[in-house]
Amino acid sequence: MGYSKLERNLIDLMKEEQAKLGYRKEAVRLYYPLSSLNHLFEAEDSVDAMQERLIHFPEDMTAKLGMLAVTHKGDRFCFRIPEEGSEYVHEHMGANEFIKELVEMLWQHGTTMEQIRALFDRHADGVICENIDNGEFDYLLRFPESVGDPYYYCFKNEGCHIIYHRFLPEDYADFDF
């Protein structure tokens, strides 16, 4: 279960990166704190135990992403995904991927929360929208569980544009906003 969650998260982050920066067939490095990896594996591993867990990846995962290399400094883990992983993600990103549409919308100055909400609503019924006042963000939007997008999308109106960050629910809870 944990490896499939990790694979999905790695692919989702790479899709987001490619939506923002464009595609290049190159190796990618993604960083995770130990706490996030423990959430993905539903574990309470130490740094050493997590490093041991990440030595061998399932064959179906490496068939998609290539031979991943994992290192760590302290409790910060680095995943190096080879260029074939970048290529796999690029080839499997749909033209109407939600994250791609969101990034393109937020590139535009003058984008409103109403437009962002409409984008969410075009992708699913029952979108949850909360006003939040935690000093970091103004709004939290998320899809219902049935949609299969587990992330909490947090938005901040910076005046001339809106920024966002997305979190897995467990990571969002760790911030204790």
Where is each model-derived feature located?
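Positively charged, polyanion-binding regions of nucleic-acid-associated proteins
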Residues: 2-29
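Long, charge-rich, low-complexity intrinsically disordered regions
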Residues: 2-3, 91-98
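Charge-rich, solvent-exposed alpha-helical interaction surfaces
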Residues: 9, 13, 40, 53, ...
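Short glycine-rich, basic-tinged beta-strand/loop micro-motifs
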Residues: 24-44, 98-106
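Charge-enriched amphipathic alpha-helical scaffolds
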Residues: 28, 38-67
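Charged low-complexity interaction tracts in eukaryotic proteins
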Residues: 60-94
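A cross-family detector of function-defining hotspots
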Residues: 112, 118-153
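Intrinsically disordered, low-complexity regulatory segments enriched in Ser/Thr/Pro
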Residues: 147-177
